[in-house]
Amino acid sequence: MMQFVIAAPRSGSGKTTVTCALLAALKKRGMDPCAFKSGPDYIDPMFHRSVLGVESHNLDLYLSAKNTVRELYAHYAAGHGAVVCEGAMGFYDGQGLTTRASAWELADALDLPVLLVVQPKGASVTLAAEIQGLVHFKPESHIAGILLNDCSEKLFRMLKPLLETETGLPVLGYLPRLPQAVVESRHLGLKTAGEITDLAQKIGLLADALEANLDWATLEALTERPDPAPVPPPALQTAGVRIAVAQDKAFCFAYAETLDCLRTAGAELVFFSPVHDTTLPEDICGLYLPGGYPELYARPLSENKTMRDAIRDAVNGGLPTVAECGGFLYLGQTLEDASGTAWPMAGVLPGKGVKVGRLVRFGYADMTAKADSLLFHAGEHLYIHEFHHWDSTDNGSGFSVWKNEKIQWECGFASMSLYAGFPHLYWAGTPLPRRFVSGAKFYQRQKRNTHD
């Protein structure tokens, strides 16, 4: 099986573009590829899914233990003909000023070769020096080959012998610049895949260009690895509860692994749209409001008053509810849109969502629960991630958040039927799915007893 990591010296080098082009080309060649993303990013896996038509999965060595990451990789890679892991940021850049949770640490943990994506603009010999530095920064860099991005054929033919001589690494090919295939960006990075109407056409152009300019035989020889050791499938529970999951253009940041863990714990997931549907699905015993871009759809969310009222009444009535980041903002009193206009929201929580215009409390952190609640025990610790340009006038105080070994802030609302806060939680390898489903089961029993 071909297995490798796509990495680059820095952000903005075109990793996602190259990854999507490679996935499409591999699929075209009948390789049945699957994809992973290093780190907590939600958007890149959406692009992978658009190419493959199957789920892409996150592997994060800050949010998860190494054994959990290895098990997730083996589980989701099983049965595929090729595995492509897209790195995040620069190759060695991880949490803070360390390599923790970097693309390099993932390659090292999984013992995978790395294809280094390099943009050659404005450099030649210096490019070789930079690559040498990356190769020798760690005793085992895992860098196996080089791919030039945004590169002309003429420049490729000039640089290939130079780079191979100076670095000892094969230059496997190049992806030329295609102005007609550029994907625009937005405040969380790239636009989501569902918002780009001509995405399939753009990726098709990129795949054709890469397929024509890549040394496939060498790539296969460098990246062929034994299939990951199989892991026993998780034992499926039969809790018999339905959990409603918000899923639309406003709420699109849910880890596929989280949803799978909820199913394994016994939940039947029922998807709905707070933008378009008028009420919650029937006979639900739990509600999951993930993150996304509610600030960009504040008006239609607000104008859907029947849905806002249904969610407010359900949450206030004790329906077990988890609301992360954008879902947390939706439960507030009002939410400002991009122009600063405040729109009424569900009104469950006291805070108002406000536009800040910069990243707020960005990055990895550690969160400690102050009291027992739906998802947590008092004193329990969980690794989290935050990434948002909006804030709330009341972020709650149910948790202490640690960053760089210091208490930085308090956040979150927690009760025996609620978790709501800005932090994104990674559920795989934790007791959270089981506890959420257990809370839903308890709610179901209470509801039946009331009706009896």
Residue ranges and their predicted role:
Residues 294-372:
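Cysteine-nucleophile active-site neighborhood
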Residues 112, 169, 316-320:
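A short helix->loop->beta-strand "cap" motif at the edges of active sites that frequently abuts
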Residues 1-2, 236-242:
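A short, charged/proline- and glycine-enriched loop
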Residues 124-235:
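Internal gly/pro-rich beta-alpha loop/helix module
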Residues 2-110, 118-142, 150-157:
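ATP-dependent carboxylate-amine ligase catalytic core
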Residues 241-305, 309-314:
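Phosphate-binding active sites in nucleotide-utilizing proteins
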Residues 37-38, 171-179, 268-276:
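Beta-strand->loop->alpha-helix junctions that form or flank phosphate-binding loops
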Residues 107, 212-213, 237-239, 251-261, ...:
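C-terminal and late-domain segments of enzyme folds
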